[in-house]
């Protein structure tokens, strides 16, 4: 019999873990990006389909290799961003994702940080791909983006040239970009 104490996940986390929404790669994605953590092994790739005229996210999906909190955070993020402008999506915080899930145990905050990090990397990659930089997009990388880069560097040191998912579209692990 196990002596492990289960983490106090909310009913929403457990529901989205068992029945994730928008799971799977998106073949017609405008852009995608990945964020991962070698500390726990979690990886999230976010795919966005963008209405370029309206600058609005019309569809989002994800791939997740990780724990219940990782899958739930990516799933809820894809629901939250749909219908938002790119700028509105950029302003989403890891805390908002955690709150949408009914809270996460402190030891699992990094899961919502990874989801938001992948989102922000996808947004940056989108504008880099277009050769544009809107005035609201900060020059400096966010904490979530910096964490993703730190973790990718650690992966590279541990494993050499390494791509988490084997092929992101314009951003994420394994790319030569720094954001």
For each predicted feature, which ranges?
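Active-site- and interface-proximal helix/loop "cap" or "latch" segments in soluble metabolic
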Residues: 39, 49-113
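Structured beta-strand/loop patches that form or line metal/cofactor-binding pockets in enzymes
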Residues: 23-57
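Broad hydrophobic/π-residue packing in well-ordered secondary structure
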Residues: 8-10, 17, 45, 61-62, ...
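C-terminal binding/interaction regions
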Residues: 2-28, 32-33, 84-88, 92-179
């Amino acid at each position: 019999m196990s002596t492990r104490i289960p983490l106090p996940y909310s009913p929403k986390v457990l529901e989205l873990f068992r029945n994730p929404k928008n799971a799977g790669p998106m073949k017609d994605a405008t852009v995608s990006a990945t964020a991962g953590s070698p500390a726990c092994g979690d990886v999230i790739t976010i795919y966005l389909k963008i209405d370029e005229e309206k600058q609005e996210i019309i569809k989002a999906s994800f791939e997740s290799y990780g724990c219940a909190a990782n899958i739930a955070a990516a799933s809820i993020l894809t629901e939250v961003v749909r219908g938002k402008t790119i700028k509105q999506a950029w302003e989403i915080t890891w805390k908002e994702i955690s709150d949408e899930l009914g809270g996460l145990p402190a030891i699992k905050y990094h899961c919502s940080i990874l989801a938001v990090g992948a989102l922000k990397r996808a947004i940056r990659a989108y504008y880099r791909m277009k050769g544009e930089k809107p005035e609201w997009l900060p020059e400096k990388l966010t904490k979530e983006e910096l964490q993703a880069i730190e973790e990718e560097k650690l992966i590279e040191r541990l494993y050499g040239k390494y791509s988490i998912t084997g092929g992101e579209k314009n951003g994420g692990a394994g790319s030569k970009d720094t954001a």
